[in-house]
Amino acid sequence: MVSKKQKFLTVILVIVLAIVIVGGVFGISFVKGRVTFPWQLQNSEAKTEQVKEPAKEEPKLVIKEKKQDESAKKEQELKKAKEEAEAAVEKETEKTEEEPVDNLLNDMKLKYYGKLAVEGSHLVDADGHEVLLMGVSTHGINWYPEYASAETIKSLRDTWGINVIRLAMYTSDYNGYCVAGKENQEKLKDIIDDAVEAATDNDMYVIIDWHTLNDADPNEYKADAIQFFGEMVRKYKDNENVIYEICNEPNGDTTWNDVRRYANEVIPVIRNVDAIILVGTPKWATDLDSVLDKPLDFDNIMYTYHFYAGTHHKAERNALRDALDEGLPVFISEYGLVDADGDGNLNEKEADYWYDMIRKEYGVSSCMWNLSNKDEGSAMINADCDKLSDFTEEDLSESAMWLIDQISQLKHSDLEQGVDWITPENNNR
């Protein structure tokens, strides 16, 4: 039987053991942090906030640093791209200066339409569609035969895109056809023959121009003209691209009646073939009023009008406009952007007015004066250039570059469809 004392000691021992066990458990939990005691709660929350706050800030710092790195990288890439672009532009500029001007035209060429005719006031193709001839006039082939060469004609067709060239053969000036003997006549005809062949090979029209000038009245050498054009027609009867200009610029006291009398005798010789014939008008090819009063009674006839932008302005444009509105068929076989004497500075403002009128308003065909390297404002080749082809910008005058620019502005559809380039413009200029 257990005594009271033993029972008491046993209870005491159990209590001590319980205290030891519970204390051990709490001690271990406290050290490992698995149990949170009430007195630990406030401190634990504070520590949690301290831990959480850096967790919010650290991603921001990382993102900001990343953005800065990306921004710096983009700036480097942009700088590199800009340097490469500038280098490319500089290289292309050098290339443009060295290469022929065909790059300016993107290889566009004015259309060749085949056989032409005159209907009303318009030059048309075989289907009756209006056409546009744009090109150049040589200076006198008596002085500058080299620019009527096959090399030059092919180059201008390929690089400038023109579709007509006018061969200015002077009749009474230096080495003129009518004043320098038979041998000279044969040389001039050989030049024409080579040029006609080159134009034909390159799908171009060619104007054979009986270039009267100091012989103010074309009747002075009428017999020579009849003989010459008779020979030309027999030689080129099968060339539908040949156009005949029977006199250049009647001047002085020459009247339209004088020109009319001359034309009535020369035209029948050419009319043996149904070619286009251009007839010069009085007062240096500016008097269309006289023609309106008494036009010629032939088919496929056009009347020439000449202007120089430095000399001829609004009054002359109005005179041409009146004639065109009356239905007179006009061909501008010679024009320049400088003064009427062929020299002086380019008058670009007036030139643009003229061009807008003759091309956009009326679609009048034209040839710019002059294809040579003569030291004067109207020459298209610079005086220090002796090349005959593959001209660069440095080789060309302002007049030539203006013409190339005008051709380059024509739309592709304009070149192929003919009438789309006729756009009414403001007439008050």
Swiss-Prot record:
Keyword tRNA-binding recorded: no
Top-level class of the enzyme under EC nomenclature: hydrolase
Annotated region described as Disordered, given as residue ranges: 46-100
GO biological process terms, semicolon-separated: cellulose catabolic process
EC number: 3.2.1.4
Single GO MF descriptor: cellulase activity
Domain of life: Bacteria
Family assignment from sequence similarity: Belongs to the glycosyl hydrolase 5 (cellulase A) family.
Protein name from the UniProt record: Endoglucanase A
Organism, as annotated: Butyrivibrio fibrisolvens
